């Protein structure tokens, strides 16, 4: 069991991570801005990832993601990336950093709810198909058709025949996607028992995060070992050349984000596409233009 000092340190890092999440949107992508915030650059201690280095690497990788986006649009490439892992493993965090500076018309997130009564009667993969990309699009699945191999298996939401049929079907389904020109990447975010315990406690005691905890999440915690067995079976039976699994060590949230983004960029045959210069046109002005005052009753009160 972790000592009080270890737990206290982890809680502190979790708080700092939430603070840095706000900074990510506010900081400019330049070294001067980082100098003002963190002071002159110093060498990281062995095994440590400084906040300054994290921001620098995140911004660098996000610049590459913009290049990837431009290349996808230019070439009509189609990309699907699946993010799987236990509850609180950090899937949403890396998805947020990937999409943070991208065009939502090009890169979108698919996070499907539990199937409704009608969807439960469909071909299992049917409800996912409508979310697949057209040319020039990237789709990030925050959980995916692998729910059947994980939560549905562990919680008893599918029977043995449905479970086995999934394993018979999913390799062919993913090979079909590959033949259609879709590049498919599959990531499993791996966290330890102790780390999930800490992250759940953080959510329980943070009013801004309690919404992230569902009764299903709490039950999944109790069934940790069953999830381990389900995960191992899934990776073994669905790791195929056309769509291999990649495991992200995710106990350290920031390292996991950087490692995952760096890896997915390496899997893409993208290049920088020259962009035409953008010129701001002069505003047209007409002699008879009048801007009428806005009625006071529809103006939002300036409380702040």
Curated annotation (Swiss-Prot):
It is an enzyme of class 2 (transferase). One of its GO terms (molecular function) is polyphosphate kinase activity. Keywords: ATP synthesis, Kinase, Transferase. InterPro entries: P-loop_NTPase, Polyphosphate_phosphotransfera, PPK2-related, PPK2_PA0141. Uses inorganic polyphosphate (polyP) as a donor to convert ADP to ATP. Its EC number is 2.7.4.-. Belongs to the polyphosphate kinase 2 (PPK2) family. Class I subfamily. NCBIfam families: PPK2_P_aer. It holds the Pfam family PPK2. This is ADP-polyphosphate phosphotransferase. It catalyses: [phosphate](n) + ATP = [phosphate](n+1) + ADP. GO terms for biological process: ATP biosynthetic process; GTP biosynthetic process. It comes from Pseudomonas aeruginosa (strain ATCC 15692 / DSM 22644 / CIP 104116 / JCM 14847 / LMG 12228 / 1C / PRS 101 / PAO1). It comes from the Bacteria.
